UniProtKB/Swiss-Prot annotation:
PROSITE patterns: LCN_CSAB (PS51863). It is found in: Secreted. This is Putative sodium channel toxin Ts30. GO terms for biological process: defense response. One of its GO terms (cellular component) is extracellular region. Has the structural arrangement of an alpha-helix connected to antiparallel beta-sheets by disulfide bonds (CS-alpha/beta). SUPFAM superfamilies: Scorpion toxin-like (SSF57095). Residues 21-85 form the LCN-type CS-alpha/beta domain. Expressed by the venom gland. InterPro entries: LCN-type_CS_alpha_beta_dom, Scorpion_toxin-like, Scorpion_toxin-like_sf, Scorpion_toxinL, Scorpion_toxinL/defensin.
Length: 89
């Protein structure tokens, strides 16, 4: 039973370490890239590719959201990023 618990813990922590990172890329002021229309969006796909090293992006809640971003990408909410103080851009 103890061995099973160790194996499950290793699998869990291993999966977290290699977890795919998704999120909102940000402008230099810490704000998200706004978009419309919602859903498939060529502008968001371009932003995600250029700013986050992502292969796919779409417009979600009026902001560009990127999937499977590079480890170097800076995303909204990352520590050390500026806080956005603008409600509408």
């Amino acid at each position: 039973m103890f061995k099973l618990a160790i194996i499950l813990a290793l699998l869990f922590f291993g999966a977290r370490a290699g977890a795919v990172r998704d999120g909102y890329p940000i402008l230099s002021d810490g704000c998200k890239y706004t978009c419309k229309p919602l859903g498939e969006n060529q502008n968001c796909s371009r932003i995600c590719k250029e700013k986050a090293g992502s292969w796919y992006g779409y417009c979600y809640m009026w902001a560009c959201y990127c999937t499977d971003v590079s480890k170097k990408a800076v995303l909204f909410g990352d520590s050390g990023t500026p806080e956005c103080h603008v409600w509408i851009k």
